[in-house]
């Protein structure tokens, strides 16, 4: 049990902007923009934003907004065309940025006014009471990076580099000593030329990346020499040139009203830079949040210490809950995962889906979206830390389309032009939703709206009940939340069958709750059922827990 600070619990809704509003149902494999169409920023009108907010959401992460490498030709608008050898898919990866100061033309109705459309979307999002999350991709850029929209006073990345040096702290890139880029492991017939080759984004400091490398990107240089005689050395004095340029990019977008940055592969960038950059950004914009994609639990506290507000809890909580859903671990294993980050729990971002992970409903994961509901109840209601969901999750999107570069892998593509039917139905053609999709949406809405409606769930104390209930620990997970006199009991059931259990409230929890025997009325927050409870030390409560769901009972204790 631990105490938490009073605050609004963030519920982040990730949208892949290019896909979200697309209503072109052609869905041709490897289809072009003209064939398959593309969602636009204007698709997020007030009505759509209100529907998203009504799910219980507080933040929207607009993924893929910054201009990135693409095989689509916008040269008639003065936008440089990207070579297809170094583009993944037709639409391209949103994490191969080719201009940090530009908005992707695909998602604009008026390409020449694409920045104006983004500014208008920020304004609309704020108008309905939601906050804006935007990508920041600090580790790498597209191979043909060249900014055409940077402010006049800004020098471009690589513009002043000395490419004869493999490493210099004042270079923005790493170079392969005059060797040309060799894409023979990627392309049948390479026509793209890069001399000298730049190091590839996933720390490949040689000129021949493989097809499994991030070959379409180049690594940014933050003052670390990865290839010196000792293996690695830091060169942070004087301040590396890249630090200034990347911090200027953050300040540029923060000035436009971006409320939070989701920082891609944050742990591939040195903590020294993050301490320097977050300090400068938060000095100017103290409310701006930094979300870190960090996968090494031993580094969590280091990244929090240098200014990150929230970090992905993937290797711990996500992996655990996924295993519980799939029957590979007992539900009681969840206890260990929150305990592992007990001292930093406010900073851990829980999720069940995002663009990198397989959809719950896909056969690669659970094969049934309903199996994610007990995990949703547990992860969303346990603690005051942020929770994130991915557009389409609330409708049971399976991610099983074969779109092109992405293939059929249980994930929704980030490389191709496509229409995601579950999102199209849920937001623009609701008459086409199935009863199962409507039912799942209502469950998500009911659970997520409780998060900030109930004080005990938003900011209350947490009490894990599993140590006193080891007899139910295989497929059920139970805990209490408490704020003042309000107590909420949550029990989730990962089993596909309804179960009857005897739940023990241990003496320590009883003393924390009230300390004296008392009769109370408990009300279900999911279906409004009521039941009488007599609370006493080491009490046992008979409960019936529905299949693939849970119970959430609220009790208001009397004054002593």
What label would you give each PLM region?
Residues 11-13, 60-62, 132-134, 261, ...:
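Hydrophobic faces of well-ordered beta-strands that scaffold small-molecule active sites
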Residues 1-131, 139-141, 146-150, 155-164, ...:
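N-terminal structural segment of carbohydrate-active enzymes
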Residues 22, 26-42, 96-115, 217-242, ...:
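The substrate-binding groove and active-site-proximal loops of carbohydrate-active enzymes
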Residues 496-560:
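C-terminal beta-sandwich/jelly-roll accessory domains of carbohydrate-active enzymes
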Residues 38-52, 237-254, 372-376:
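Short, acidic/polar
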Residues 122, 140, 152-157, 168-181, ...:
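Active-site-proximal helices and loops of the catalytic beta/alpha 8
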Residues 23, 70, 85-88, 345, ...:
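Loop/helix patches that line or flank the sugar-binding groove of alpha-linked glycan CAZymes
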């Amino acid at each position: 049990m631990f105490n938490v600070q009073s605050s609004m619990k963030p519920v982040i809704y990730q949208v892949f902007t290019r896909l979200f509003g697309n209503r072109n149902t052609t869905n041709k494999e490897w289809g072009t923009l003209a064939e398959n169409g593309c969602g636009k920023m204007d698709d997020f009108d007030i009505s759509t934003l209100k529907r998203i907010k009504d799910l219980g959401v507080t933040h929207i992460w607009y993924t893929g907004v910054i201009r990135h490498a693409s095989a689509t030709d916008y040269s008639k608008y003065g936008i440089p065309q990207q070579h297809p050898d170094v583009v993944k898919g037709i639409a391209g990866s949103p994490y191969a940025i080719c201009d940090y100061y530009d908005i992707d033309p695909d998602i604009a109705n008026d390409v020449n006014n694409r920045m104006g459309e983004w500014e208008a979307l920020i304004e609309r999002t704020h108008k309905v009471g939601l906050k804006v999350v935007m990508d920041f991709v600090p580790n790498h850029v597209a191979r043909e990076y060249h900014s055409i929209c940077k402010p006049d006073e800004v020098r471009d990345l690589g513009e002043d580099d000395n490419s004869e040096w493999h490493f210099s702290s004042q270079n923005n890139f790493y170079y392969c000593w005059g060797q040309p880029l060799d894409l023979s492991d990627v392309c049948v017939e390479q026509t793209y030329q890069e001399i000298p080759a730049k190091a590839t984004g996933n720390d490949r400091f040689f000129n021949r990346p493989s097809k499994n490398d991030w070959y379409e990107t180049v690594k940014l240089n933050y003052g670390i020499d990865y290839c010196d005689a000792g293996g690695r050395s830091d060169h942070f004095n004087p301040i590396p040139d890249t630090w200034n340029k990347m911090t200027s990019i953050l300040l540029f977008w923060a000035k436009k009203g971006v409320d939070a940055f989701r920082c891609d592969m944050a742990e591939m960038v040195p903590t020294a830079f993050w301490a320097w950059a977050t300090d400068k950004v938060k000095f100017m914009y103290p409310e701006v949040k930094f979300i870190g994609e960090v996968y090494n639990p031993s580094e969590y506290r280091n990244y929090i210490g240098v200014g990150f507000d929230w970090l992905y809890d993937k290797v711990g909580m996500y992996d655990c809950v996924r295993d519980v859903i799939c029957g590979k671990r007992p539900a009681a294993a969840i206890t260990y995962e929150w305990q592992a980050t007990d001292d930093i729990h406010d900073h851990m971002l829980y999720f069940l889906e995002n663009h990198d992970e397989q959809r719950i409903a896909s056969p690669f994961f659970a094969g049934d979206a309903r199996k994610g509901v007990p995990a949703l109840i547990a992860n969303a209601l346990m603690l005051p830390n942020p929770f994130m969901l991915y557009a389409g999750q609330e409708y049971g999107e399976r991610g099983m389309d074969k779109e092109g570069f992405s293939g059929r892998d249980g994930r929704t593509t980030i490389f191709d032009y496509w229409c995601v039917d579950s999102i199209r139905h849920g937001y623009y053609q609701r008459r086409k939703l199935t009863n199962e999709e409507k039912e799942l949406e209502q469950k998500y809405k009911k659970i997520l709206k409780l998060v900030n409606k109930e004080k005990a769930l938003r900011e209350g104390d947490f009490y894990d009940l599993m140590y006193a209930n080891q007899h139910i620990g295989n497929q059920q997970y139970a805990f209490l939340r408490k704020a003042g006199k309000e107590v909420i009991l949550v029990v989730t059931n990962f089993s596909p069958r309804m179960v009857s259990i005897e739940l023990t409230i241990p003496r320590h929890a009883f003393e924390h709750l009230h300390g004296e025997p008392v009769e109370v009325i408990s009300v279900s927050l999911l279906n409004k059922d009521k039941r009488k409870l007599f609370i006493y030390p080491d009490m046992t409560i008979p409960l019936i827990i529905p299949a693939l769901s849970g119970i959430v009972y609220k009790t208001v204790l009397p004054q002593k």
